[in-house]
């Protein structure tokens, strides 16, 4: 259970894609530091082009239980970040319940595989629609509440290592994650006058349902040269990172200890991007 004197005590965090994996980890870790949580996830299939299983209502319920186990309050709802009206309604309800909004973790995203010229319209539009447009809609819905609260705050945009380098075999994903860098850096300038910081993080090889090892193996078997764009991590040559390791960085960026940082791209990759 979180201590009353946690580093984020009295603050409120809005976390997308919160039903499982990174999103749940971020929500729970922020709660452990004293923040109350607004948690959302679609809890349904995003598109027929996304081949791994979606999060479920039961997953979101488990996030709620985990946050409450930390002694914090949580407002959870099944919302598609592509749905502007539902996002705005949730933000309004969160502010009404908790009185403020201080932290946004724009975490929700989807991944797919395919060479750029072989992608279907549905594959392209789903990934861009969720990862880029959905993130923009999230920020458009939450930023006014942060400004109105007048407390400054921190926005963490969850991009990817694919937002900093080429990733053959999922160029639509890389395009969406690169675009988040421009979104992050522009917003960092625009929100500076309000004391709101905006940074992006770029995780690499995290153990979540999105990884789809079989899809990766099939892609590399068909196109062996692509494997060079997915090197092992120098600090951890085998296996994947855990969501909790990414949450270490999210919690730090949410708090005052990172107060000098805004408009930064932070690789969370155990050195892999240095190859």
From Swiss-Prot:
Active-site residues, record numbering mapped to chain: 173 (proton acceptor)
Signal sequence range: none
EC number from the UniProt entry: 1.-.-.-
SUPFAM superfamilies named in the record: NAD(P)-binding Rossmann-fold domains (SSF51735)
Chain residues that bind NAD(+): 20-22, 41-42, 80-81, 107, 177, 206-208
SMART domains registered for this protein in UniProt: PKS_KR
Transmembrane stretches, start-end: none
Family under the similarity heading: Belongs to the short-chain dehydrogenases/reductases (SDR) family.
Listed PANTHER family: DEHYDROGENASES, SHORT CHAIN (PTHR24321), ESTRADIOL 17-BETA-DEHYDROGENASE 8-RELATED (PTHR24321:SF8)
Name of protein: Uncharacterized NAD-dependent oxidoreductase MT0715
């Amino acid at each position: 259970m979180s201590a009353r004197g946690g580093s984020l005590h009295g603050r409120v965090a809005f976390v997308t894609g919160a039903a499982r994996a990174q999103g749940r980890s971020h929500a729970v870790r922020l709660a452990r530091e004293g923040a109350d949580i607004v948690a959302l996830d679609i809890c349904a299939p995003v598109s027929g082009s996304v081949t791994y299983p979606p999060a479920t209502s039961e997953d979101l319920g488990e996030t709620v239980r985990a946050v409450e186990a930390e002694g914090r309050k949580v407002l959870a709802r099944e919302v598609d970040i592509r749905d502007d009206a539902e996002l705005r309604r949730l933000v309004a309800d969160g502010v009404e319940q908790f009185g403020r909004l201080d932290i946004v973790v724009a975490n929700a995203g989807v991944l797919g595989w395919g060479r750029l010229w072989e992608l279907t319209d549905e594959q392209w539009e789903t990934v861009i629609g969720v990862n880029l447009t959905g993130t923009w809609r999230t920020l458009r819905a939450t930023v006014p509440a942060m400004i109105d609260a007048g407390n400054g705050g921190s926005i963490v945009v969850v991009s990817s290592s694919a937002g900093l380098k080429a990733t053959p075999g999922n160029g639509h994903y890389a395009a969406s994650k690169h675009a988040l860098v421009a979104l992050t850096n522009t917003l960092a300038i625009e929100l500076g006058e309000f004391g709101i910081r905006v940074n992006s993080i770029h995780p690499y090889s995290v153990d979540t349902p999105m990884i789809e090892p079989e899809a990766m193996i099939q892609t590399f078997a068909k196109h062996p040269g692509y494997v060079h764009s997915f090197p092992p991590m120098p600090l951890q040559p085998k296996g994947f990172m855990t969501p909790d390791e990414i949450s270490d960085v999210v919690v730090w960026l949410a708090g005052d200890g990172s107060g000098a940082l805004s408009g930064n791209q932070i690789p969370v990759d155990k050195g892999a991007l240095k190859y």
